[in-house]
């Protein structure tokens, strides 16, 4: 494999030295020579972090990812969030869209003539990769291993130190099972450490409870993934208006939570001229954008609670599933017993 201006850590352990042991003071002395991590997308994503961005389908994950890449490759901030790096090369592994679908998001459309014009101009530092269906030889190795190796090879050969993978579903055949995704995240973490890469991985969330705040339990596959990454944030949809989204921190390693439930970044998604993007509106509370119970909703949720109880769920687990308090579940079940 050819590396262009990019080498793994020269102090990497020799073959056979899987675990490197030093005193705590030695580790600290070694770390003193390394710079404090810089922000790539405000406090959501720092340099040399493995970060996951997740949301439900059609919530603008890919649009936000491209918006972040555009800011990094041009050395500018976006959404009022600090970007502390100089303009940098980024490689975007777009494993979902075709080139035409990508083009349509970043051009104006003359509906009368049915043509695209006034295309948005990205930096030449922005590299995009998509799958060549003729490039995979099924007889050589399994698809997931082949794709992972290609991601490593193409990134090292490009010289990029920042990469975005869109998305996890296209890399892992069954990412609802932790046993399938855990090895992939471990391998990504190893690449991050070997090459000093900054990695943003896009993931879906299964259909979630719109009455409850977004949490690590909503990430596709398993909340245990959180333990394998450095940071994580989510895009939520406002129940006031589907074009309004909010960004919420789920996990941080550097610093404190700046954008938890009580202080989410509220944006409006749309296309201005030739660029589909998020536009900053305000900071707000997540509770203002969640679905709220009315009489019909409450009856539906109570019935669901009864179904879950019959399925063997504990009161605590029912409360977590439905986004209500454990006390409310206990009250509903007690009322049901009295009515019987």
Residue ranges and their predicted role:
Residues 5-19, 157, 239-340:
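C-terminal regions of RecA-like/P-loop NTPase motor modules
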Residues 12-109, 117:
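The Walker A/P-loop phosphate-binding site
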Residues 18-19, 85-176:
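Conserved inter-motif catalytic segment of the P-loop NTP-binding fold
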Residues 52-53, 58, 63, 85, ...:
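Phosphate-binding/switch region of NTP-binding enzymes
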Residues 73, 77, 192-193, 309:
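Conserved ATPase "switch" residues in P-loop NTPase domains
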Residues 101, 172, 209-210, 258, ...:
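Activation segment
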């Amino acid at each position: 494999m050819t590396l262009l201006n990019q080498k793994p850590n020269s102090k990497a352990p020799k073959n056979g030295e899987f675990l490197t042991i030093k005193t705590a003071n030695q580790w600290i002395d070694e770390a003193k020579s390394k710079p404090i991590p810089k922000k790539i997308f405000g406090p959501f994503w720092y340099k040399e972090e493995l970060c996951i961005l997740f949301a439900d389908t059609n919530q603008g994950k890919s649009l936000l990812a491209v918006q972040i890449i555009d800011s990094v490759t041009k050395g500018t901030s976006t959404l009022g969030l600090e970007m502390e790096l100089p303009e940098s090369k980024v490689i975007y592994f777009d494993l979902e869209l075709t080139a035409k679908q990508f083009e349509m998001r970043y051009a104006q459309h003359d509906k009368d003539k049915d043509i695209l014009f006034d295309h948005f101009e990205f930096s030449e530092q922005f590299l995009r990769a998509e799958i060549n269906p003729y490039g995979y030889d099924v007889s050589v190795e399994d698809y997931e291993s082949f794709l992972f190796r290609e991601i490593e090879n193409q990134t090292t050969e490009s010289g990029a130190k920042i990469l975005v993978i869109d998305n996890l579903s296209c890399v892992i055949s069954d990412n609802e099972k932790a046993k399938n995704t855990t090895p992939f995240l471990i391998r990504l973490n190893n690449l991050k450490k070997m090459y000093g890469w900054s990695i943003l991985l896009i993931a879906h969330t299964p259909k979630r409870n719109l009455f409850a705040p977004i949490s690590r339990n909503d990430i596709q596959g398993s909340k245990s993934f959180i333990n394998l990454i450095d940071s994580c944030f989510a895009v939520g949809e406002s129940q006031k208006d589907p074009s309004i989204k909010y960004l919420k921190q789920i996990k941080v390693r550097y610093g404190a939570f700046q954008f938890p439930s009580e202080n989410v970044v509220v944006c409006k998604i749309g296309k201005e001229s030739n660029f589909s993007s998020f536009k900053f509106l305000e900071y707000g509370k997540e509770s203002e954008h969640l679905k709220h119970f009315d009489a019909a909703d409450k009856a539906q949720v109570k019935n669901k609670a009864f179904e879950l109880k019959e399925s063997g769920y504990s009161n605590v687990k029912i409360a977590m599933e439905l986004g209500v308090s454990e006390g409310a579940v206990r009250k509903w079940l007690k009322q049901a017993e009295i009515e019987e």
